[in-house]
């Protein structure tokens, strides 16, 4: 809400506001009348009829022909053709590979390359065999170690079983044997020497 300025000032402002509103209302009514009268005087063109074509018309049923491109324009490779990598040339550039016209020299080169590849394959096979032998040897060593452990384990088991069965008999017999074989020792007398 707006702050109140006082009773006298509000009365004056109301009077001036009423004068302004009455003058503005007459102007507004005139402008309203003039606009509406202008609209009545202006003639509108009659509405045009828009004719729609039936969908069954032949022109709509016909499909527009699209342009068909040839294989050369699309730069498509020929189908069912296996071309070696060296033969394929990139567009607009020369390939740096030169092929031999003589068939025999071509075959010798091929034989050399194949021999190298076979050698590599053979070396891989040899390495695989060596690795397999190493694995087999390690496996055997591990098995031997496990057998030794089992053997030691079984021995200790047997020893413990024997000790349990015999109990204190063996220990007492050993003590008796030790005492009978060695004469009893005399206790050493302590001597003190004066300088």
UniProtKB/Swiss-Prot annotation:
Residues 46-60, 136-159, 167-178 have a biased composition (Basic and acidic residues). Keywords: Coiled coil, mRNA transport, Nucleus, Ribosome biogenesis, Transport. Its main location: nucleus. InterPro entries: Loc1 (IPR037650). Residues 1-74, 136-195 are annotated as: Disordered. Transmembrane segments: none annotated. Residues 186-195 have a biased composition (Basic residues). Component of the 66S pre-ribosomal particle. Belongs to the LOC1 family. This is 60S ribosomal subunit assembly/export protein LOC1. The lineage of its organism: Eukaryota, Fungi, Dikarya, Ascomycota, Pezizomycotina.
């Amino acid at each position: 809400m707006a702050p109140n300025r006082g009773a006298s000032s509000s009365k004056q402002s109301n009077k001036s506001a009423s004068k302004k509103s009455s003058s503005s209302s007459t102007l507004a009514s005139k402008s309203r009348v003039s606009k509406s009268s202008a609209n009545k005087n202006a003639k509108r063109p009659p509405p045009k009829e828009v004719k729609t074509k039936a969908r069954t018309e032949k022109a709509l049923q016909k499909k527009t022909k699209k342009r068909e491109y040839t294989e050369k324009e699309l730069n498509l490779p020929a189908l069912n053709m296996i071309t070696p990598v060296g033969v394929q040339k990139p567009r607009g550039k020369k390939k740096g590979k030169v092929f031999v016209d003589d068939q025999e020299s071509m075959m010798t080169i091929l034989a050399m390359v194949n021999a190298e590849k076979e050698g590599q394959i053979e070396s891989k096979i040899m390495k695989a065999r060596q690795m397999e032998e190493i694995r087999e040897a390690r496996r055997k060593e591990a098995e031997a170690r496990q057998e030794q452990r089992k053997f030691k384990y079984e021995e200790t088991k047997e020893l413990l079983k024997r000790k349990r069965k015999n109990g204190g008999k063996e220990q007492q017999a050993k003590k008796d044997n030790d005492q009978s074989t060695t004469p009893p020792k005399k206790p050493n007398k302590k001597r003190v020497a004066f300088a």
